[in-house]
Amino acid sequence: MPEILEVVDVDGGPYGVTVDETGTLWFTLAARGAVGRLVDGTVETVALEPADGSPTVIMAEGDGAWFTEFRGNRIGRVEANGALSFLTAESPYGLCRAGDGGLWYTELSAGGVVHRAPDGTTTRHAVEGMPSMIAEAADGTVFVTLNQGNAVARITPDGQVRTTALPTAGAGPVGLATAADGAWFVELLAGQLGHVDRDGTVTEHPLPDRDARPHAVVVAPDGTVWFTEWAAARLGRRTADGEITELALPGAEPHGLAVAPDGTLWVAMESGALVHVRP
């Protein structure tokens, strides 16, 4: 059974979390308008100006991290020394590293998915339905959840956009993570996990509590699927044989979730904490 190792209190609405190669935890504070990191047990934060940009999704890279501000219409980069830089973007939300060293991000309100090459040039794909989270698979296929479109989109390496409607109406897909055989995603409003194959075939897996409101999902190196249950304040685990177990979390509203290099997990509780969990 998973075990809570520590709880770090952080005000300001922790939302997204990511862990870099050294084990440093980076996070966004959506309510405060800040980003931060946890270094040797010490919380360090960097205020953003203006503070109402809603920093949400964050991705560690090198000595810093990238993050999105969908209300601020920009993508930020924070360095280990606290230095900030920004790129202009239209309502960015989901963010991931591209195989060519560039970035992929979603335009939550503008109905687009954008690839930013290492040289700064951008290619935009029109993808309606409130594109939310995004992830690129090893073969270059990009998966995107369409929260209002009730679908999952795939962008092939040659740039074709293919969309698969979900079997359950009004499922509200959000969180997404790639796996060896496609991608896993959560259905916030239907209380289900979903899996999409590389060919677009979708299967759905109901949770024990259909009102749990799953939000974020990650896939561990061993293939275990972990997910947060926003309404139920729990961390869920699905093993390869389909068994689901759940761990009650302190506080409320778990959002972001990340796997550390040592295999432990971090959960962002929007009620004001970062929770460290042993699998």
UniProtKB/Swiss-Prot annotation:
Q: What does this protein do?
A: Inactivates the type B streptogramin antibiotics by linearizing the lactone ring at the ester linkage, generating a free phenylglycine carboxylate and converting the threonyl moiety into 2-amino-butenoic acid.
Name of the featured protein? Virginiamycin B lyase
The record's GO molecular-function terms, alphabetically, read: carbon-oxygen lyase activity; magnesium ion binding
Indicate the segments annotated as coiled coil, or none if absent: none
The similarity comment for this entry is: Belongs to the Vgb family.
Q: Which cofactor(s) does the record list? A: Mg(2+)
Q: Alphabetically list the UniProt keywords.
A: Antibiotic resistance, Lyase, Magnesium, Metal-binding
Spell out the PANTHER family in the cross-references: VIRGINIAMYCIN B LYASE
Its quaternary structure?
Monomer.
**BP-aspect Gene Ontology terms:** antibiotic catabolic process; response to antibiotic
Its top-level enzyme class, in one word, is lyase
The residues annotated as the active site are: 255 (proton acceptor)
* UniProt: Mg(2+) binding residues: 253, 270
Report the superkingdom from the record: Bacteria
What are the binding positions for substrate in this chain? 215
What residue ranges are annotated as transmembrane? none
Question: Key word Transmembrane helix present in the record?
Answer: no
- What is the primary gene name for this protein? vgb
What is any Pfam family matched here? Vgb_lyase
Q: Which organism is it from?
A: Nocardia farcinica (strain IFM 10152)
Its Enzyme Commission number(s) read 4.2.99.-
